[in-house]
Regions:
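Extended, low-hydrophobicity, polar/charged segments
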Residues: 1-175
Length: 175
């Protein structure tokens, strides 16, 4: 597991380069909020991968963590995640747990899980775009990645986990 931002960034770039992924790096002013950084990058909110770490209780004894990845113009549907995970309770993970599991700080969480304790679930509506955009484990650098390469490398579980599109984000942005 990564222990700092540089590790997460390096791990991501190494993975992409080793597999010949098609991506572009985009430098910008430090910003982690999807609705603010998207215009800086020149992408539509629907192309932004908003990444949210959730805690799901399964019964009384089992706790699982989910990295929910949704379009930037949508809100995560907690009940849909709970149902998909066959959980009994779902909530947002605390920032310290989210950052430990994701290997980067809030606002820079990658739409990849390099941690076996963090299950990656992606809403398929994000994958309708030719490219997806996200902060590259840094507030001052983003990445545009071909969607086909993202699917091949991240190997996400797909599930409809959004409440709606085109609404103001109701959850903290962790893209």
């Amino acid at each position: 597991m990564q222990t700092n931002i540089e590790d997460a960034y390096t791990q991501l770039i190494t993975l992409l380069d080793q597999h010949g992924a098609h991506y572009r790096l985009i430098d910008h002013a430090p910003e982690g909020r999807t609705e603010i950084v998207s215009p800086m990058r020149g992408n539509a909110l629907s192309q932004a991968a908003k990444c949210i770490v959730l805690m799901v209780k399964i019964g009384k004894k089992i706790t699982r963590y989910v990295l929910a990845v949704i379009p930037g113009d949508a809100r995560v549907d907690l009940q849909a995640v709970k149902s998909l995970m066959r959980g009994t309770y779902v909530t947002f993970a605390s920032p310290d747990i989210a950052e430990r599991l994701a290997g980067s700080v809030t606002g820079t969480i990658l739409p990849f899980s390099f941690n076996p304790e963090l299950e990656l679930i992606v809403d398929p509506s994000l994958l309708e775009n030719e490219e997806i955009y996200f902060n590259a484990a840094r507030l001052d650098r983003s990445l545009a990645l071909k969607t086909g390469d993202y699917i091949a490398l991240a190997k996400p579980r797909l599930g409809r986990i959004t409440e709606g599109r085109g609404t103001s984000p109701g959850a903290p942005s962790h893209s």
